[in-house]
Amino acid sequence: MEIDLNADLGEGCGSDEALLDLVTSANIACGWHAGGANAMRDCVRWAVQKGVAIGAHPSFHDPENFGRKEMQLPAGDIYAGVLYQLGALSAIAQAEGGRIAHVKPHGALYNQAARDPMIADAVVSAIHDFDPSLAVFGLANSVFVAAARQAGLAAVEEVFADRGYRADGSLVPRSEPGALIDDEDAVLARTLDMVRDRQVRAVSGEWVPLNAQTVCLHGDGPHALAFARRIREALEKAGVEVVAPGVLQAGEGI
């Protein structure tokens, strides 16, 4: 059994280089919610050195809210914004001897694309028109994953061990009770449930089936790095091999 571990980098958390020793895919902020040219360059350089797959992490242009405020924008604006951010990271990756392998939207853009076909199609169209060989990372069982596959893109289904799930497979909004799971033992158990058993317990009690192909490790917080290491060690102890998704192993972006 295999699983990919990914982390969102270049967001000012300070543990990016160390996290790259634990993950197999890196989603690098493109400056619209956090980070900037220098942070992007650092993260790309480290990823190239460590053999970690490079991904773009585009968002709404919303640094004031860290890209977490939902926005209602025309499809053309979303398309252009994603294209702009892909171009910026791609240029830096090329200069550092790497290339982008995948794209994972950030924050509100991620969540809205997961449920809104218009937003999903706008993001997918930008990725496809930029480079149809790119894979996309999206919430397991989401509208975004379906839209990517419909467009002929490779889609990698993502799960979150430290986030609460609703019965429909969506994430509990951060503003609601049960959105974040702080108990480390519970998070470890949920990770194994999702990776080995392909299911997660919703906040309402039901078991929700899902296809876990990559697990997001959050790098913020004082103990995040040590906990990320615990998750990787628990997976390996359970006989799960931690590798980049098959669609990224063909040499794209590594």
UniProtKB/Swiss-Prot annotation:
Enzyme class: hydrolase
Highest taxon in the source lineage: Bacteria
Catalyzed reaction equations: 5-oxo-L-proline + ATP + 2 H2O = L-glutamate + ADP + phosphate + H(+)
UniProt feature coiled coil, ranges: none
Record-linked CDD domains: LamB_YcsF_YbgL_like
Its job: Catalyzes the cleavage of 5-oxoproline to form L-glutamate coupled to the hydrolysis of ATP to ADP and inorganic phosphate.
Assembly and interaction partners: Forms a complex composed of PxpA, PxpB and PxpC.
Protein name listed in UniProt: 5-oxoprolinase subunit A
Organism the protein comes from: Burkholderia multivorans (strain ATCC 17616 / 249)
Gene coding for it: pxpA
